[in-house]
């Protein structure tokens, strides 16, 4: 590459980066994927390393953030700049970071240095200022020097302390605001947000705090500005003691191998978190060393963000189909030229809704950017408009006017972005999806009734609503099911046993299983703990349907209340409930806060093989005694119950000093519970 070519390429890269920084930071409307942006940054970095003389022509250093264009929100000057983090894309980049730190501190390269490893949440940075223990103001990062005042909306974020005991005279806490995947799924039907990050950013900027509260924003705190504490580990511990939410997964690594292993583990398990992370932040743990290292105008020298490998790829959009969800929402699906993303062949991806197709200007024949995050359904996140060819359909995509399953006219409710089929129980596709939801793990957990079996019974008209599941036992005895493809005596017996085992169910699981719109797992538990019994819940919901005022249940918003009212106003739904009431033993719900058991309020993790019960059964029983059951061992885990063939969870628990019980000790503990009742 000649000098002129390299100079032109640098100018082109700077122009592209400047444009995309404005789109991302000022408008929350990126036109390229994170992976594409990172590739531009990496190319510029390599170009400047190869041609150092180009530094004289580098007229764009990027931005820390940018002041979002929203004149409604007052601006706040930060007491200390909110800097960005320098990115590391490869192991070599991380090695350079560690070497640079040691060199700057005049350390022997062979001497270890403790690194705090924290997940990098893909959200919105904030700074919360406290004076004399009281929350005074909360601001966004903005451009790093000037942020937006989001105090009123931030005050409705769950578990963000308004008062702190034993706090210094002035305290500034920083962290990240984000939205859980389950809350985004509920919101995307009614609001035009492309992803959870954009949804969190848009929600926190609402002038009406009630709207932000209903959207259930969450946060993680990870910084105390100008802290006198000796380490990042001590800072996180102090934040937790003050009542702030902190990362559940953190590692303090004494060598780079451990840090990289943590990066790999979090990359492999990120889909189980329920929120987006896009890398791991490495910080020098010793705060005295942090101060010695200092910062550039853009980045702290004592930290770097080790980004995850790209989970995105570009492929051709062959066609657009639509599918019907259990609540009637019509979701457009991208039919793709098959492409390998992260080791999985992807041929279909979600397009979210009609508004997203229009906003991104997606057309059949386009080269589209597809993102796959763990077990989350792949989604189209953008279009490479520069690659649009003559074969791309010139007209905008026309959304169907009728349901592809039942032929009913589609409609869109005021204030919603999703098109919907309102035929409900007369729509076969909705019935199918409702049954799948009903038997899912967090519903009645009928293990022997999988997707193919459900489709078979629905298509054969043996199931027309969820209550029909419990008449299958009788129907199977009158049909020659074993003659059907895929059915044998063993699978039939397993199915009948699974249905029999599911007839006893906790109230919260039952409410969730009904698939009522806006009533997810968390909301179902809040409702169940409020009413305690099935009969009390049904009485209250019947009164609600008859026009009486709703009960005040903390955490249950107006949309959820109206959805419950609509559900109990349907004669079809009431008939199904009546049948289920006759078929099931619905257990009363025990509120965690009022359970007197020795495990009430404790976080318990099960691992290995238990002899007397399955881990799922053990977890359910622990929850009825007021315990919280986790999937991974963290510093917040209280007890690990280890069966035979326990793996890495046992090693982690021992390393963290967490109480470990074998199955016999666990059963002895449960005996003390039963003896006290």
Swiss-Prot record:
Catalytic activity: NAD(+) + (deoxyribonucleotide)n-3'-hydroxyl + 5'-phospho-(deoxyribonucleotide)m = (deoxyribonucleotide)n+m + AMP + beta-nicotinamide D-nucleotide
Residues where Zn(2+) binds: 403, 406, 421, 427
Catalytic site positions: 120 (n6-amp-lysine intermediate)
Domain BRCT positions: 594-677
InterPro entries named in the record: BRCT_dom, BRCT_dom_sf, DisA/LigA_HHH, DNA_ligase, DNA_ligase_AS, DNAligase_adenylation, DNAligase_N, NA-bd_OB-fold
NCBIfam families the record matches: dnlj (TIGR00575), PRK07956.1 (NF005932)
Xref: HAMAP family: DNA_ligase_A
Protein name (record): DNA ligase
Lineage of source species: Bacteria, Pseudomonadati, Pseudomonadota, Alphaproteobacteria, Rickettsiales
């Amino acid at each position: 590459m000649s000098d002129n070519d390299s100079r032109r390429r640098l100018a082109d890269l700077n122009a592209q980066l400047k444009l995309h920084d404005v789109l991302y930071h000022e408008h929350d409307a990126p036109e390229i994927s994170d992976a594409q942006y990172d590739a531009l940054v990496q190319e510029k970095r390599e170009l400047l390393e190869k041609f150092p003389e180009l530094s004289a022509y580098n007229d764009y250093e990027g931005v820390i953030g940018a002041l979002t264009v929203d004149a409604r929100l007052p601006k706040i000057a930060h007491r200390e700049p909110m800097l960005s983090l320098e990115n590391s894309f490869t192991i070599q980049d991380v090695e350079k970071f560690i070497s640079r730190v040691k060199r700057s501190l005049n350390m022997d390269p062979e001497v270890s240095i403790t690194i705090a490893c924290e997940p990098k949440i893909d959200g919105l940075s904030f700074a919360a200022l406290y004076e004399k223990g009281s929350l005074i103001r909360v601001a966004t990062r903005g451009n790093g020097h000037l942020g937006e005042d989001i105090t009123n909306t931030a005050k409705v974020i769950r578990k963000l302390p308004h008062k702190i005991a034993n706090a210094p005279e002035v305290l500034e806490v920083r962290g990240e605001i984000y939205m859980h995947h389950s809350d985004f799924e509920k919101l995307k039907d009614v609001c035009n947000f492309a992803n959870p990050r954009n949804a969190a950013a848009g929600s926190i900027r609402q002038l009406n705090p009630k709207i932000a509260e209903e959207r259930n924003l969450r946060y993680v705190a990870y910084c105390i500005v100008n802290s006198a504490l000796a380490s990042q580990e001590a800072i996180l511990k102090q934040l937790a003691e003050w009542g702030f939410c902190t990362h559940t997964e953190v590692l303090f690594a004494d060598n780079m191998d451990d840090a990289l292993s943590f990066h790999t583990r979090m990359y492999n398990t990120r889909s189980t978190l329920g929120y987006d992370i896009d890398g791991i932040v490495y910080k020098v743990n010793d705060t005295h060393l942090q101060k010695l290292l200092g910062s550039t105008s853009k980045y702290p020298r004592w930290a770097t963000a080790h980004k995850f490998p790209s989970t995105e790829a570009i492929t051709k959009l062959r066609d657009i189909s639509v599918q019907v969800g259990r609540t009637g929402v019509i979701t457009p699906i991208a039919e793709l030229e098959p492409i390998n993303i992260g080791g999985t062949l992807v041929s279909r991806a979600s397009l979210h809704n009609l508004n997203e197709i229009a906003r991104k200007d997606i057309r059949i024949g386009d080269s589209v950017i597809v993102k796959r995050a763990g077990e989350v359904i792949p989604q189209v996140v953008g279009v490479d408009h520069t690659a649009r060819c003559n074969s791309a359909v010139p007209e905008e995509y026309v959304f169907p006017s009728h349901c592809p399953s039942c032929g009913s006219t589609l409609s869109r409710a005021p204030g919603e972005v999703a098109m919907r089929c309102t035929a409900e129980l007369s729509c076969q596709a909705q019935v199918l999806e409702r049954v799948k939801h009903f038997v899912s793990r967090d519903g009645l957990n009928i293990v022997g009734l999988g997707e193919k079996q459900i489709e078979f019974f629905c298509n054969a008209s043996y199931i027309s609503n969820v209550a029909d599941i419990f008449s299958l036992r009788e129907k199977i005895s009158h049909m020659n099911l074993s003659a059907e493809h895929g059915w044998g005596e063993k699978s039939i017996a397993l199915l009948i046993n699974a249905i029999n085992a599911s007839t006893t169910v906790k109230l919260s699981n039952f409410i969730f299983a009904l698939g009522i719109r806006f009533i997810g797992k968390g909301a179902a538990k809040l409702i169940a703990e409020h009413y305690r019994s099935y009969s009390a819940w049904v009485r209250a919901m019947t009164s609600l349907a008859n026009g009486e005022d709703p009960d005040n249940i903390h955490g249950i918003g107006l949309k959820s209340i109206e959805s419950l009212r609509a559900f109990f106003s349907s004669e079809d739904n009431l008939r199904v409930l009546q049948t289920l009431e006759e078929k099931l033993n619905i257990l009363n719900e025990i509120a965690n806060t009022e359970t007197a058991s020795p495990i009430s309020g404790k976080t318990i993790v099960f691992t290995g093989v238990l002899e007397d019960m399955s881990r799922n059964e053990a977890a359910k029983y622990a929850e009825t005694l007021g315990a919280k059951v986790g999937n991974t061992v963290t510093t917040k885990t209280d007890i690990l119950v280890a069966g035979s063939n326990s793996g890495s969870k046992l090693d982690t628990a021992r390393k963290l000093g967490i109480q470990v019980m074998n199955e016999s000790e666990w059963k002895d503990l449960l005996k003390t519970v039963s003896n006290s009742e």
